Curated annotation (Swiss-Prot):
The encoding gene: ZNF428
InterPro entries, per the entry: ZNF428 (IPR038977), Znf_C2H2_type (IPR013087)
Keywords: Metal-binding, Phosphoprotein, Zinc, Zinc-finger
Organism: Homo sapiens
Residue ranges of the region described as Disordered: 1-162
Compositionally biased tracts (Basic and acidic residues): 138-149
Lineage: Eukaryota, Metazoa, Chordata, Craniata, Vertebrata
Modified residues (Phosphothreonine): T108
Zinc finger (C2H2-type) boundaries: 161-183
GO molecular function (one): zinc ion binding
Name assigned to this protein: Zinc finger protein 428
Segments of skewed composition (Low complexity): 84-94, 116-129
């Protein structure tokens, strides 16, 4: 049957050698047993089996287990993460110290700095301006620009897209793309 060699002969490992004896399965393991490979009855069962294999959360059997854990579980399965905590309470206004409008005690006026939309119309000036300064109107067309600047802008509007390879100008992005593809093929 089988021989066990001494550890000195095999380098510390025991080996089994087969004799000429035919080792066929016993009567309890016939070739028609339930352990033989069988095809699933339908594609639906096959899909269900594949899903079960892919969604296992057992790290011993699932090589992608750690990735799934980082990403929040497998496909459509319930997440094992703890539910998110409620948002922390809103901080009081850094300028006046009052609670934000939604958390202010009833009857107290809202903070004009935190909630300018609900505060009375007497809102203070924004932080960027000092009191007494007026807002400047945006410059009107033709005002505040040097005369030579208009010509440069018109030139840029004609060819707003520039090739980075040869500095040619194009009216639209499609033309520039086509030109760039010519560079890529070596035709330009």
């Amino acid at each position: 049957m089988t021989e066990t060699r001494e550890p000195a002969e095999t380098g510390g490992y025991a080996s089994l050698e087969e004799d000429d004896e035919d080792l066929s399965p016993g009567p309890e393991h016939s070739s028609d047993s339930e352990y033989t490979l069988s095809e699933p009855d339908s594609e639906e069962e096959e899909d269900e089996e594949e899903e079960e294999e892919e969604t296992t959360d057992d790290p011993e059997y699932d090589p992608g287990y750690k990735v799934k854990q980082r990403l929040g579980g497998g496909r459509g399965g319930p997440s094992r993460r703890a539910p998110r905590a409620a948002q922390p309470p809103a901080q009081p206004c850094q300028l006046c110290g009052r609670s934000p409008l939604g958390e202010a005690p009833p009857g107290t006026p809202p903070c004009r700095l935190c909630c300018p939309a609900t505060a009375p119309q007497e809102a203070p000036a924004p932080e960027g301006r000092a009191l007494g300064e007026e807002e400047e109107e945006p410059p009107r067309a033709g005002e505040g620009r040097p005369a030579g600047r208009e010509e440069e802008e018109e030139e840029e509007e004609e060819g707003t897209y520039h090739c980075t390879e040869c500095e040619d100008s194009f009216d639209n992005l499609g033309e520039l793309h086509g030109h760039f593809m010519l560079h890529a093929r070596g035709e330009v």
